[in-house]
Amino acid sequence: MSDDDSQDDSVPEGDPRRYATDFHAPVLSHDVQARLVTDASGRYVDATLGGGGHARALLDVLDPDGVVLGIDRDPEALETARDRLADEREAGRFWAVHGTFGNLRDVLAAEDLIPIDGLLLDLGVSSHQIDVPERGFSFRDEGPLDMRMDPQRGLTAQQVVNGWGERDLRDVLREYGEESRAGQIARALCDARPLDTTRALAEVVEDCAPPPDTVKTLTRVFQALRIVVNAELDELEQVLEQATEVVRTGGRIAAISYHSLEDRRVKRYLRYGNFEGEPRRDLYGTLVAPWAETPRGPIEAGESEVEANPRARSAHLRVAERRDDDEAGAPLPPLS
């Protein structure tokens, strides 16, 4: 199957491989179809467009007058998705713009697309970004220390590793990688500078984390650097807050996360409308909860999907429906 195939029609509906391409294999696409779409003639946004797999899945369950807008900061992803969905672009059912989902409100205002009926977030890094050594996301291959999702702008991992002080590096590894060896690794990175490639970075980390902890430690370190380079958690908090403003009452948000830092923020915001996980009351004593989880708790991939796409193993899909502001006083469950 080539990157520009809309889907593999030889694969039955509901099969996790149906919307996969060499660029990226979207996870939980059947669940997204079933739970995000509330109006088949509605307006939907895939704010993490990638190779267009989820956008294709949404278009397949929308009526001819339903539309999907794709947003991505990666120019390669935009080009791939536009080529893949060329027929839908021609029909006016799909279009894509370059941008970050942290600017969701401004993007939608520019496209005259407020309110929307549904918002999809498939967080983290794509398969393509990991698999291309030149992007600098993988510790397994030699590549430049880049890690930018938009390679045309912003801070690189090389600038962080070589330019930040030991204390700042330690804090990054501890906060964004939840790495217990953060202090030791930060000190070793500073001693080994300058570091210019992914393998040079990986070798320093490997010296600090012998087997059996090596791979997990490398994963956490590269995750931490990627998060800070792309301001991923800041962007996530911004898009969740803006979703409350742009999704219509009765519309939905679907967010797929891959690690606890993402999932914790999504869970707390969709359950409580804040990132502290604290029930809050307005001036009249009413509990403020702009979203209602549906269902309560995460949806995870089944065995067949994990077998077909191992990346799905860590995926957590959370879906919530925008409440009417007058209904926001419903009882709230405790945060588990």
Curated annotation (Swiss-Prot):
<keyword id="KW-0808">Transferase</keyword>
<dbReference type="GO" id="GO:0005737">
    <property type="term" value="C:cytoplasm"/>
</dbReference>
<dbReference type="GO" id="GO:0070475">
    <property type="term" value="P:rRNA base methylation"/>
</dbReference>
<dbReference type="Pfam" id="PF01795">
    <property type="entry name" value="Methyltransf_5"/>
</dbReference>
<dbReference type="InterPro" id="IPR029063">
    <property type="entry name" value="SAM-dependent_MTases_sf"/>
</dbReference>
<comment type="function">
    <text>Specifically methylates the N4 position of cytidine in position 1402 (C1402) of 16S rRNA.</text>
</comment>
<feature type="binding site">
    <location>
        <position position="72"/>
    </location>
    <ligand>
        <name>S-adenosyl-L-methionine</name>
    </ligand>
</feature>
<keyword id="KW-0949">S-adenosyl-L-methionine</keyword>
<feature type="binding site">
    <location>
        <begin position="52"/>
        <end position="54"/>
    </location>
    <ligand>
        <name>S-adenosyl-L-methionine</name>
    </ligand>
</feature>
<protein>
    <recommendedName>
        <fullName>Ribosomal RNA small subunit methyltransferase H</fullName>
        <ecNumber>2.1.1.199</ecNumber>
    </recommendedName>
</protein>
<feature type="binding site">
    <location>
        <position position="129"/>
    </location>
    <ligand>
        <name>S-adenosyl-L-methionine</name>
    </ligand>
</feature>
<keyword id="KW-0698">rRNA processing</keyword>
<dbReference type="InterPro" id="IPR023397">
    <property type="entry name" value="SAM-dep_MeTrfase_MraW_recog"/>
</dbReference>
<keyword id="KW-0489">Methyltransferase</keyword>
<dbReference type="InterPro" id="IPR002903">
    <property type="entry name" value="RsmH"/>
</dbReference>
<feature type="region of interest" description="Disordered">
    <location>
        <begin position="294"/>
        <end position="336"/>
    </location>
</feature>
<comment type="similarity">
    <text>Belongs to the methyltransferase superfamily. RsmH family.</text>
</comment>
<dbReference type="GO" id="GO:0071424">
    <property type="term" value="F:rRNA (cytosine-N4-)-methyltransferase activity"/>
</dbReference>
<feature type="binding site">
    <location>
        <position position="101"/>
    </location>
    <ligand>
        <name>S-adenosyl-L-methionine</name>
    </ligand>
</feature>
<keyword id="KW-0963">Cytoplasm</keyword>
<feature type="binding site">
    <location>
        <position position="122"/>
    </location>
    <ligand>
        <name>S-adenosyl-L-methionine</name>
    </ligand>
</feature>
